[in-house]
């Protein structure tokens, strides 16, 4: 979470933080989601690290398939379903499972500060 009242400082901090998250295997997409908002004079930025873009249930077949591809809002707890059938069958346990699946492990999270400070030292 980045909290700032100065957008210039916020931008600099954000770019350094985002550099700590390597892109996916194809090098096309960074593995994180961002949620940003402003309250009064404060800017809030929440970074959700990702291990993968879509959960296995997205590619499953038959009744196991759920077309849920978590974005920033989903990672923050507002689950978006594009099909009524997915809305009808999703459970709290399934949501937790999907978020855990596309999120990162504790071990991966512990590496982020080191990469952040390495990137910051390069600037």
Please describe what each predicted stretch is.
Residues 1-123:
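HIT superfamily nucleotide-processing domains
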């Amino acid at each position: 979470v980045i909290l700032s009242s100065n957008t210039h400082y916020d931008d600099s901090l954000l770019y350094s933080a985002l550099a700590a998250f390597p892109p996916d295997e194809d090098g096309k997409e960074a593995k994180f989601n961002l949620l940003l908002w402003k309250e009064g004079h404060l800017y809030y930025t929440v970074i959700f690290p990702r291990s993968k873009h879509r959960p296995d249930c997205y590619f499953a077949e038959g009744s196991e398939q759920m077309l849920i591809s978590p974005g920033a809002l989903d990672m923050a707890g507002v689950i978006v379903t594009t099909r009524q059938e997915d809305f009808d069958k999703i459970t709290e346990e399934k949501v937790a499972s999907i978020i855990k699946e596309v999120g990162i492990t504790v071990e991966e999270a512990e590496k982020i500060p080191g990469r952040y400070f390495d990137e910051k030292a390069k600037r």
